[in-house]
Amino acid sequence: MKLIMENWRGYLAEAMKTLEDLPDDLYIGIMDEGGENVHFYYSDEEGNDTDFYDDPVSGAVSITRPQTRKQAWGDKEEPEGDCAGAWVISSTEATKGWGPLLYDIAIEWATENGEGLTPDRFAVSTDAVKVWDYYLTKRSDVSADQLDDLENSLTEPEEDNCAQDSAKDYAGDNWADTPLSKKYTKPPTTLAQLRKMGKIRERS
């Protein structure tokens, strides 16, 4: 499964696909690697991921529990904090038009199995910032909650502490005003429809 860091180039310009656009032979795969890493991807009926080069629709969104991990550009290890129980985006890629559906599914699953989803804490593209801003300002079905940084700049409790490298790189001292500084939750409406349609394929 080919994965890249969070980068949704063209998200807002593309025609966003919905459940109604899913072909009969296309499914949603969910692969849970021991409760620490989870992948959401387009699959065939057997749960095998589709191919970026051979299939018309392919894509994957991967999320992880907050942890100490190496930054994408080097060997330096940085803690992410508890992030108020939210999962963290680790990588994304999708055929044009098919990314948003996977993203909604990831947020819903992270809400069902945790306290929501937050952007990559260390590296987010300019295009991805627009995506998160869209969730923050345009999606009434998505809720956003502020996270603190690792220095407790906003609140005393440490449970909401979360690495804010991406937000601070983007906005400096105004990091708390950015969509990158928050976690997002969403009712599982899309997942419920997929389950009713028999379109979920789960693997471990």
Please name every model-derived segment.
Residues 14-22, 27-37, 50, 57-78, ...:
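Terminal substrate-recognition subdomain of acyl/acetyltransferases
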Residues 1-15:
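Short acidic, low-complexity intrinsically disordered linear motifs used
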Residues 94-110:
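Conserved acetyl-CoA-binding loop-helix of GNAT-fold acetyltransferases
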Residues 41-56, 88-94:
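Secondary-structure transition/turn motif
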Residues 73-94, 120:
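Conserved acetyl-CoA binding element of GNAT-fold acetyltransferases
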